Amino acid sequence: MDRLKYDIVVLGAGESGVGAALLAQAKGLHVFVSDYGKIAPKYKEELNRYAIPYEEGRHTEAIILEAKEIIKSPGIPDTAPIIRQAVAKEIGIVSEIEFAGRYTDAFMVCITGSNGKTTTTMWLYHTLCKAGLDVGLAGNVGFSLARQVAYDPHPYYVIELSSFQLDNMYDFRANVAILLNITPDHLDRYDHRFELYAEAKMRITRNQQPEDCFIYWEDDPFISRWVAEHPPVARLLPFAMEARTDNTTAWINEKNELVVMNLNSPFVMDEELLALSGMHNRHNAMATAIAAKAMDIKNEAIREALQDFKNVPHRLEKIARVKGVDYINDSKATNVNSTWYALESMKTRVILILGGTDKGNDYTDIENLVLSKVDGLIFLGIDNEKLHKFFDGKISRIADACSMHEAVSLAYKMASKGDTVLLSPACASFDLFQNYEDRGDQFRKEVLNL
């Protein structure tokens, strides 16, 4: 049985899990990787190349439950039987980010929130690179932090963090923590209790020191209340659409300029010059600018980066104009609030493609925008009953689709010249697609084939 005892067992063999295994091995730890599903060929080849033992299609309890510590991939819920058994045996369970943080003294800039995480992460990464910093991109984007710490270390990292990653972080410290917003999402993973999900997001301030910064959206009532009731140790640098208090660090003034104050020299920029439009992107730009200013990046570099950034794929990505109709891919909108921001930014009549795997959604939040802007709804999913129950009778044209080909064909028939066909599903993608990227890629392919 001794041969089955490992220092580290990694559950999940995606980028996060394989990166953790590589770092564990590099640090001289005896590591084993277990994936209940199929391991992608590129990761299997990598594990073989580094002679890291692994299994797929099962979780062997005799091995896993003898580990000194388990590194859990964020996609594995706490309700998984193997996790419950590990907890019962009091085996420590951490995230890949937590594990990687033990082996680096790099400056960590961490971004979380229900919406805007990827855009802000990429925008800030772009800004720091433009300023000449040697910076790594990690978390939900780029290569895993563990892989980079092992084989491509940087003095700075910009890290996108989900609530699932924050759940299993205990000693990790964010030098700059950014919380963009908190709206109901992934409630199926949090016993359908918003407060549990919100508490996970607030963990980003854990272990911060007085010299660190906490950047947050001051207009969010939950965040503001939480900050008042549980004052973080770090310096507070809030942003808002208007200057709410003397402490407000960034806002949009009456001249429609983005203003950053209270950080060495003031920063002012016409919001029309921002690379991305829409209210949500003003928030993302303010958070980016505050973080850059807090890191002593020069105004010129910040201004350039805010102006020439290219948005991430699958986030309000314009695919094509076909016979006077614009087709926009917002497949990354996996919750209702993301779809709200997408609809808010639309300047034309909309044919909206909604649906997928519901995560405890409340469609009341987008009802007014749908009623005022949407001329047709297409429900793309295996089970559209909840969508029909909410929207039937409110929008005259509603259709169901069980494939992206069918959804785009229906949208093409519904749309009139000057309209926008918007894929902004407000749901996860796992009923019909591998992930939101696959969903967006299929949308792009179907549109370009029209």
UniProtKB/Swiss-Prot annotation:
UniProt GO cellular component terms: cytoplasm
Keyword set, alphabetical order: ATP-binding, Cell cycle, Cell division, Cell shape, Cell wall biogenesis/degradation, Cytoplasm, Ligase, Nucleotide-binding, Peptidoglycan synthesis
Listed EC numbers: 6.3.2.9
GO BP of this protein: cell division; cell wall organization; peptidoglycan biosynthetic process; regulation of cell shape
Subcellular location per the Swiss-Prot or TrEMBL entry: Cytoplasm
Main location: cytoplasm
UniProt pathway annotation: Cell wall biogenesis; peptidoglycan biosynthesis
Residues bound to ATP: G113, S114, N115, G116, K117, T118, T119
PANTHER family: UDP-N-ACETYLMURAMOYLALANINE--D-GLUTAMATE LIGASE (PTHR43692:SF1)
Entry similarity comment: Belongs to the MurCDEF family.
The protein's name: UDP-N-acetylmuramoylalanine--D-glutamate ligase
Protein source organism: Porphyromonas gingivalis (strain ATCC BAA-308 / W83)
Lineage per the UniProt record: Bacteria, Pseudomonadati, Bacteroidota, Bacteroidia, Bacteroidales
